[in-house]
Amino acid sequence: MIYRWLLLVSCLLLALLAQRGAAKSSSPKIAPPTKIDHKPSSLFYFEDTDTVLMNTVNGDLLRSVDAGETWSVVEGDDGGMKHHVLLIRQHPYDNKKAYALGPNGRHWVTTDQAKTWASFNIAEFPAIRHYPLVFHGGDSSKVIFQGEECAGRYCIVRSYYTTDDFATVKLLRESTGGCAWAVGHPQFAEDLNLAEEIKDRSFCVVPGLKVPLPHANRLVYSDDYFKGNAEGTETKLQEGRPVSGVISTAAVKKFIVAAAKSKGTEELALYVTVDAKNWHRAEFDGHRIEEDAYTMLESTNYSLQVDVLTSPRSGMGVLFTSNSNGTYFTRNIEHTNRNSEGMVDFEKIAGIQGIVLVNTVQNPEEVESGSAKKKITSRISFDDGRTFQPLKSDGENLHLHSVTALRNIGRVFSSPAPGLVMGIGNTGNHLQEYAECNLYISDDAGVTWRRAIKHPHKYEFGDQGAVVIAVRDEGRVDKINYSLDHGKEWASVELQHKIYPTMVTTTPDSTSLKFIVVGSLKESQDGEHVIYSIDFDGLHERKCEEDDFEKWPARLDEHGKPDCLMGHKQFYMRRRANANCFVDEEFKDPQPIFEACKCTAEDFECEYRRTEDGKGCVIPSPLTPPEGECKKPDDKFMGPSGWRLIPGDACIRDGGENLDKEIERSCKDASSPSTDGKIRVTLQLLEARDYAQYYYLERQSSSSGSDETIIMLSSEHEVYVTHDHGKTWERPLKGEEITRVYLHPYSSDVAFLLTDGKEGFWTEDRGHTFKPFQAPAPPTQDRFLQVMAFHPVHKDRLIWTGAVDCHSGDCHSDAFIKKGRGKNWEPLLSYVQKCEFESRETRPNSTNLVYCEQFEKQSKNGRLQLLSSDDFFNDNEVQFVDVINYATMSEFIIVASRQPENPDSLVASTSVDGRTFARAQFPPNVQVPVQTAYTVLESSTHAVFLHVTASSTEGGEYGPIIKSNSNGTSYVLSISAVNRNSLGYVDFEKAQGLEGVAVVNVVSNVADVSKKVPKKLKTMITHNDGAQWMLLPPPTKDADGKSFGCSVVAGKGTDDCSLHLHGYTERKDERDTFASGSAIGLMMAVGNVGDHLAGGDEADTFITNDGGISWKSVKKGKYMWEYGDSGSVIVIVPESKPTKTIHYSLDEGDTWEEFQFSDVEVRINDISTVPSDTSKNFLLWARLSNSEVQDKFATFNIDFSGVRPRPCLLDENQGNSDDYYIWEPKHPFQENNCLFGHSEQYHRKKPSAQCWNDWRESHVHSIGTNCTCTRADYECDYNYEPQSDGSCALVPGLPKPDAMEICKKDPDTIEYWEPTGYRRIPQTTCQGGLNLDHFVSKPCPNKEEEYKQKHGISGVGLFFAIVTPLAVAGAAGYYAYSKWDGKFGQIRLGESAGTSQSFLSRDSWLVTVPIAIVAGTVAVARALPLLVTSLWRGASGFIRLGRGRGYSRPYASRGSFAARRGDYTSIVDDEDELLGVEDAELDEDDEA
């Protein structure tokens, strides 16, 4: 019996010993490693589970349900997932759902943590440039899937949606910028009771109504998946109005952010909303945001964090934090470190409010100058970024590698383990290279640090920080280090294989005792990988109890006491570092403990923004005092302080600060002196004798700020600058002799000021500062050549044409290139005439395409060749060997060269792609045996208007205007005998902003002109882009109410009685166009009523407000005019006679008021305003004589901003409102006002509305109707020409186009269409009706079976067939603000009047002072010739001092639209005939 008892006790002891040994092991358990053949591309845990998904680069999806111990390949129900998973995405708000996307249209979803997968089909490749999946923050069953189809740089995003986890899928809509849910995050609008209203709302970035270019994109929304209204409703982003140029949207916690950018500027506007209804533009404390130059950082529940790039060259930024509604941002810290991908060294410590780690650049000035590398230092904030301090380890400053040097997946420094922070870094003055650093750890949330292990390591936290592991991150390793006491002591465990570690991870909440380590067996990290699962469960024998925890304060103040943030202190119950236990609460996140604090000043924010001293708040709008108060200006009343408690702040009000209580305010604060109904005048007497040129630096609609900047060059070559439209002037470069000014045509804040030497100055901040620069050579001495050329995309890429060898007797022009900011000038080509970048958004692979005219054999006696190159002339191709000139107009490159068979005659050739040229085919009814001159007119409607000189007799110049097809090669006659002058300018002008409207003057007595009889001109107008023309209908009465001297037929012009207008060829200031791109439908002109155009002395001033359908006489005599506030103000001043009054109209010319601006009469030389005609300020350029001064140069600023009290209110949904009505242009020749397959509708302010437009861009309300197709929507196909009856017939001798070519080019094409002789014009949007281009379809070879299935053109096909060409062509009349520098116009190719010798002989002065490609119509309208000649290339340079006008005067008046015009030149009487401005290459800037 005793023996049995001893045996029993022995067994029990052995069992207990065995059990104790099992309870505590000496090292973690490492499961047998799993080998996989391919590199992992992504890995994630389903939250609060041990289930892991891993995607490999070969398309396999692996699943583990035991935290990585074992893995299996997911094949799907039918094996279709194997090798077909392109990428995986976890649902961010539902831990049961994930998505596997395939490359071939088949995708999969799981709703049970990858136990089962259901497939769904969307025949789209997942989007790469946009989010492929967009998740709903409130309903996890709602997901948007996005695929994209791209053609060159243009992409169409197709967004599909599901409301039932992809059991059903429907098309949401096509867009250009993708779609997103309004509720993009669970916190969005959660406290606003909007759940029902916005639960189905989605936003999409869609193309402009007329142009699919980024600057025209719109943000629309729908609450019913675009079912009820396919177009959706435009989002009112700014002051209740839509905004064009929206690039993208993003959901950031409780905010939605939209970014918009206008053409002509890199500046972005960020708009923010917290309720998906009310949006505000974010302000950044004076900083500007640029595209690809800001990063949305991890933000709090109550503010946004944004890092703004301030130094593109060196990668530094400024960190900003917003107020609670995201509208006003305060600067936190400067010189933050960024990389070229926009990643910022910034991380919030997980789980603890207010602690932020950032890296900054210690030596920003040296880095910016390029003389030193970055010296990076680390800083930490414990008060939400208000203040920063160094990290400390053993009394030294510590610096850590951060996001820009990310070496692992997940967060960089922290995890949900309370207070545990790790990083790779070093102590000293600044951060060293990664390999020279060590692993540091902090267990007090970054207050103090200690070195944990030498050398860099990958690391991870587990069991709420009770376990920390680290794997050395250099070379091959075969062990894992771990610590159980917050990194004080370390142990290690061996691995079976030596690996190059790529990932170290655990559950997202860091509560597990299990870790996964992934490594490659090869240093290249390709091919075979090993997965280790490490389990620490057996290292402690017990679970922590209450005494093992401490109440740990998450934040401490400067005195080491718990600190308050957002009205409370934060604590955690945290395991003590030396506790011999594990927390072992798997998947249970540590819970913070909050203790409320009394309110302090830090718990309040300004409703708008702080005052400059930071002590108070700016009130955003004038205060309204209580009724009965403010009987006197000096009275006081109780009003708001401007402060508010930060939403979500939990501070205790009793006994605390109360900054939001009402304060005593002066009644002066409640007045608004700027809206007192008065016009204000500011006179400035300038020291200069006169002005030679002036240039407006127009702000684009996405630009911040409100300055109205003008750079004026005086007759003494001194520079004057004003930022307030002439109210004050300054001389920033006093003593410097500036001879030329160039405005950057693609960046409206940039200007270059040149001298006659190598020295120059430039500004990139709108003339606030000027920096010197050194050119590679003095400017070319050929004053008709432009010195600078600019790249449309790479804004810092420049071409300089300089004078070389001028002291040796062989003075010629060489071209140099600067490839980017900070780069040196490099030689490009010698003996050149003109060099230009030919990169265009619509021209594939053209980024480096450059055209140059070069003299053959590098001799000025040689023929002029046209060369092209894609590698900056390391290699080049000769396009033409005997070119007269070339120019770019919209998408066309048009070249004038000598006919080989007849050198005295010219030939025009055209290219769209910049590679292949086709000879222009003139219509049979335009017979000009010797073609000596062309003028290429504006081409904004995807067709070239070309004036061909038929008579060049001095004083008798005229010729037909012909219009091309969409590739610029085949022409039809538009109108005959159009007037031109001896300089090549043509009386042709398109009405800006209106499709298809143009005005010309024709010679009515052609037969008599050949007999030296003076020309008799008649004015005609077209409303359908040149297809039909009519005489202008005259008004019934003149300005005095009297009848005209001819019989007026109401509403109709007759041969004996019609209105005739003085056109471009007669203008004193060629920039004064009839129309304005922002004042849609308005035109003003000087002319007369009769049977032909009379002399200037008989001229009166006329206006139309319906696009030229009807006209009204405004004033007797000749007046100059300007439009303001998009046409709601019109100011006129007498031309060529002294005055002290102006006349103005506030109702589109219906009534006129007189205003006296001066006590004495002055002579007005010019009147100007901002090029977009959106300002309320006008500037009179005058000469003043009074008792104090005699004949003094002066400017008068006339400010109308006080005339009206408020901005107009617009309801986009209703169209008509109290302030606006919907206006539809009339096209009298077209049925239902249809042109290009649609009718348009515009918002126009009611003339009676007492408010301001305050709109930087005119806005198309809608394409009112898409019309049915007619013959007018088709043109003749290639190799076909129009016949007398309007039909298209094959050109004799030419073959039919090979329709089957499409099958050869694209093997996937199923069918082709037999040619019919017609093709749809690119800009039409017509639907249905006449179908002339598709009669007979046939199957492609070997596609007969597929052909049997009916195929219609796809959505994207329709898009690119109908809409994309508009990107190239643009709709007529893009608003002033986005057209540039003489970019529209006439390109004159050819002769000079009055020469007796052969026009094209070598000795002809025309070749010596050669010939022009003249560009004319400014913006989409006017006939401002762009004379592109070998003597003049839009030179901003030559200054004519005699008339006070220089050649290069972009932005000088309404005629000089900022983004629509640039180098506008006056004609100097004694100069040779060929003048020019930059080629018209920006015509695509059409309205949204």
UniProtKB/Swiss-Prot annotation:
Present with 7210 molecules/cell in log phase SD medium. One of its GO terms (biological process) is Golgi to endosome transport. Glycans are attached at N301, N325, N481, N845, N967, N1266. SMART domains: VPS10 (SM00602). Its main location: Golgi. Functions as a sorting receptor in the Golgi compartment required for the intracellular sorting and delivery of soluble vacuolar proteins, like carboxypeptidase Y (CPY) and proteinase A. Executes multiple rounds of sorting by cycling between the late Golgi and a prevacuolar endosome-like compartment. It holds the Pfam family Sortilin-Vps10. It comes from Aspergillus oryzae (strain ATCC 42149 / RIB 40) (Yellow koji mold). This is Vacuolar protein sorting/targeting protein 10. BNR repeats lie at residues 63-72, 380-389, 440-450, 482-490, 720-730, 1102-1112, 1144-1153. Residues 1-23 form the signal peptide. Residues 1373-1405 are cytoplasmic. Gene3D superfamilies: 2.10.70.80, 3.30.60.270, YVTN repeat-like/Quinoprotein amine dehydrogenase. The keyword ATP-binding does not apply.
